[in-house]
Amino acid sequence: MKAARFVMRSASSLSSASLVPREVELFSRYSPSPLSMKQLLDFGSENACERTSFAFLRQELPVRLANILKEIDILPDRLVNTPSVQLVKSWYIQSLMDLVEFHEKSPEDQKALSEFVDTLVKVRNRHHNVVPTMAQGILEYKDTCTVDPVTNQNLQYFLDRFYMNRISTRMLMNQHILIFSDSKTGNPSHIGSIDPNCDVVAVVQDAFECAKMLCDQYYLTSPELNLTQVNGKFPGQPIHIVYVPSHLHHMLFELFKNAMRATVEHQENRPSLTPVEATVVLGKEDLTIKISDRGGGVPLRITDRLFSYTYSTAPTPVMDNSRNAPLAGFGYGLPISRLYAKYFQGDLNLYSMSGYGTDAIIYLKALSSESVEKLPVFNKSAFKHYQMSSEADDWCIPSREPKNLAKEKLAV
């Protein structure tokens, strides 16, 4: 309780500061500027200019933070006032304030450039637990009131945008930190977190091994992997694209984990497990990865729920005060993975056959020039989305007790 009161006081003091509303309002008037993978590579090339990156980020990061802060403010009051959402909001406001300070500093000032890197590290660390903390806020809100279908739809809309915003700001900060920090901790073959020659099959195999190790620990068994690769663009050559390996690994690990769990539980009485199939295909425009299992599939009515932030098959976790807050059980694995795919104009879809198995397909852009950030912007269209009211369905809804036509008398 003391921690909660401290959070509320901290957030309240930040919100009441005269500078904060003005700065949030100011930067929210600008639309975010999406970058392509090619532009991100150019920022980190051998001729990369730290001053140019500094000048761009000191404007762009506050714009992205302010845009999503405006959306937080139009959420239901009971949700915004939960301790967890107040904490997240205070983090975003404080980070925006930290970054705005660099507007008065010259890109030619080497000390300012060094301090900017330190500030980005501080902001990144501050936002470390944003995902589970916001998830906890949703749970706190749902504990206080009944969530109607329209509100639930708005929450899904907001969380997709909120977490996509977080992915994008984290990407920009990581790029600058990894490229311009004095301590070079990144992979020497990468440009920041981007691999210009990402070996897709190697990432698939690594993600599978990580999921397999987890499956073995929990179930004491796991299915094998059957991997097929087809390079339709350059037949016979390995499949490489420009991509962020950590993003791809995140998606694949989630899909393999789900496929293994379904396979083991569905085939627990069989002498051997059916392998999980992975198919990697590079075309002229798209890279497609299909993960197929024989885990029994799911009914059609459940398929859409799998991408809902309010649906999970795992027990609801309990938050504590540690930095390592749990994420499993919030139901965020698939929806967050889909956001990673969509971030650079890709997608992630599920196709299930109940009683047989599931195909999960990741679509990514094959060309770095077409891999452009997909960013939320707070404008009139976004505002109107939150104002939608519940309307009567324009399709007939079957009654639980259909009329018995045999008893109906024909009108003469």
UniProtKB/Swiss-Prot annotation:
Gene ablation phenotype (knockout) = No visible phenotype at birth. Mice have lower blood glucose and pyruvate levels after overnight fasting than normal, while the levels of ketone bodies are increased. After 48 hours of starving, their rate of glucose oxidation is increased, and glycolysis decreased, compared to wild type mice. Likewise, their rate of fatty acid oxidation is lower than normal in response to starvation. In contrast, there are no differences in blood glucose levels between fed mutant and wild type mice.
Where found in the cell?
A: Mitochondrion matrix
Q: What is its EC number?
A: 2.7.11.2
* Protein keywords: ATP-binding, Kinase, Mitochondrion, Nucleotide-binding, Transferase, Transit peptide
Occurrences of domain Histidine kinase (ranges): 138-368
One cellular component term from this protein's GO annotations in UniProt: mitochondrion
Claim: Oxidoreductase is one of the keywords in the record: no
The record places the site described as Interaction with the other subunit in the homodimer at 157, 161, 395
What Gene3D superfamilies does this protein's entry cite?
Answer: Alpha-ketoacid/pyruvate dehydrogenase kinase, N-terminal domain, Histidine kinase-like ATPase, C-terminal domain
Q: Does this UniProt record's set of keywords contain Cytoplasm? A: no
Induction section of the entry: Up-regulated by PPARD.
Which residues are recorded as binding ATP?
254-261, 293, 312-313, 329-334
An example Pfam family from this entry, by short name, is BCDHK_Adom3
- Name a single GO biological process: regulation of ketone metabolic process
InterPro entries found in the cross-reference section: AK/P_DHK_N_sf, BCDHK/PDK_N, BCKD/PDK, HATPase_C_sf, His_kinase_dom
Enzyme class name:
transferase
- Describe the reaction catalysed, as an equation: L-seryl-[pyruvate dehydrogenase E1 alpha subunit] + ATP = O-phospho-L-seryl-[pyruvate dehydrogenase E1 alpha subunit] + ADP + H(+)
MF annotations from Gene Ontology: ATP binding; protein serine/threonine/tyrosine kinase activity; pyruvate dehydrogenase (acetyl-transferring) kinase activity
The record's section on CDD domains has: HATPase_PDK-like
Family named by the database record: Belongs to the PDK/BCKDK protein kinase family.
Function noted in UniProt: Kinase that plays a key role in regulation of glucose and fatty acid metabolism and homeostasis via phosphorylation of the pyruvate dehydrogenase subunits PDHA1 and PDHA2. This inhibits pyruvate dehydrogenase activity, and thereby regulates metabolite flux through the tricarboxylic acid cycle, down-regulates aerobic respiration and inhibits the formation of acetyl-coenzyme A from pyruvate. Inhibition of pyruvate dehydrogenase decreases glucose utilization and increases fat metabolism in response to prolonged fasting and starvation.
The record's note on quaternary structure and interaction partners says: Homodimer. Interacts with the pyruvate dehydrogenase complex subunit DLAT, and is part of the multimeric pyruvate dehydrogenase complex that contains multiple copies of pyruvate dehydrogenase (E1), dihydrolipoamide acetyltransferase (DLAT, E2) and lipoamide dehydrogenase (DLD, E3).
Q: What is this protein called?
A: [Pyruvate dehydrogenase (acetyl-transferring)] kinase isozyme 4, mitochondrial
For this protein's source organism, the top of the classification is: Eukaryota, Metazoa, Chordata, Craniata, Vertebrata
